[in-house]
Amino acid sequence: MSSKEAPMRAWLKMAGLAMSNKSWLSLGDFAGICAKTPLPMCFVVQTSSLPGGSVGATHYDRTHMNIGMVPRCYSRTVDIANTAIFQLGNAFVNILALCVILIISYNIRFKYTAIGRSEYGYFFQLCFMLICMTLVVDCGVSPPGTLAYPYLAALQIGLAGACSWALAVMGFLGFRLWEDGTRKSMLIVRGVSMVGFLLGSLVSAITFTNWIQHHPDMKTNTTALFVVMYGLNGLALLMYSVCQLVVSIFVLSNFWMTGSTILGVIFITTGQVLMYTISYEICEGVKHYLDGLFIGSICNVFALMMIYKTWDISTDEDLEFSVSISVDGDIMYNSNLKL
C-alpha cells in the first residue's frame, strides 16, 4: 500500500466508524421525527441532539417552558366561538373515522354467524376509543403544557398498542387454533390487548414523568418508548398482515382477500412514510393549514376499512352457516348455505 493510499484508508475507516456511532446513537432519538412531524408525544419529551433547524433549538430557550420539542412547521390553530382548536383538518378526518367505525360496527353486529365476529367487534371498539383519545390530545382539549397532557398522551400510545396487539392475535383466527367467539377466545384477545395497553401506557408515562422532573436537563431517554411504539407495535401489525396473506392464499384461496390485505398494508405504510418524511413540505405548501398528521389519519381510515373488508370477504360464503330451531326445539346448523 502506497503512502498516498494510507491516509485515505484511515479517513474512510474513521468516517465509517463515525457513521456507525451516529446510527447507534440515533436509535430511540425522536429529534429528527419531532422536527418534522407534530406528534403529541413530542411536546413531552426532549433530546440533547435537536437539529439546528428546529424552532426549539433556535428561537427560544425551552428550559423555562413546560413543553418539549416543537416541529419546524405545524397546522395553525383556529379560533371558533372563543375556543382554540388545534389540528382542525386532522380533527375532521378523525370525526369521519368515528362515523366509519360506527358503520362498520353496525355491520359486524348483523353478521351473526361470521367467524371472529366478537373479536372484530372488540377491535373496532378499541379503535373508537383510540380515535377519541387522539381528538383529545390533538385538538387541544388538553393542550400541551397542562399537567394532564403527558398522561393523556400516554393513554393514546397505550390504546395504539392495544389495537396493534389485538390485531396480531386476531390474525390467527383463520387457522382455527381455538374456537372463535368463546370465552377463551375473547379472554386471549382482551388479555393480549391489555398487555399491549399497559406496556405502551406505562412506558410512555414513565418516560414523560422523567421529562417532567428533569426537562431543564434538555434530554430524555426515549429508547424504550421508541422500541415499544415502532418495534413491538410494528411487529404486531406485521404478524397480522402475514397471517392474513397466508390464510387468503393457502387456506381459503381467496385472492380478493389477498388484495384487500395488500391494500391495507399499502395504506398504512404510505401514511406513515408520508407523515414522517414530508410533513414539513405539506405544511409549508398549504400555508400551515394542514400537516403530515392529516395524511397519516386519512391513510389510517382507509387501512381500517381494508381490515374490515378483509374480514368481510373471508366470511362471505363458505365460512357462513345458518342456524334454525327444529320442531323438537333442537338447534340445527347448516354449513352448506351459500350467500
UniProtKB/Swiss-Prot annotation:
Gene name, Swiss-Prot/TrEMBL: CHS7
Any Gene Ontology CC annotation: cellular bud neck
Keyword Ribosomal protein among record annotations: no
Protein name: Chitin synthase export chaperone
InterPro entries given in the database record: Chs7 (IPR022057)
Subcellular locations according to the entry: Endoplasmic reticulum membrane
Family from the record: Belongs to the CHS7 family.
Single GO molecular function: unfolded protein binding
Keyword vocabulary terms for this entry: Cell wall biogenesis/degradation, Endoplasmic reticulum, Membrane, Protein transport, Transmembrane, Transmembrane helix, Transport
Organism whose genome encodes this protein: Eremothecium gossypii (strain ATCC 10895 / CBS 109.51 / FGSC 9923 / NRRL Y-1056) (Yeast)
Subunit details: Interacts with CHS3.
GO terms of biological process kind: cell wall organization; chitin biosynthetic process; endoplasmic reticulum to Golgi vesicle-mediated transport; protein folding; protein transport
Stretches that traverse the bilayer: 84-104, 121-141, 155-175, 192-212, 223-243, 249-269, 288-308
Entry keyword annotation includes Transmembrane helix: yes
Protein's membrane topology: Multi-pass membrane protein
One Pfam family, short name: Chs7
Its biological purpose: Chaperone required for the export of the chitin synthase CHS3 from the endoplasmic reticulum.
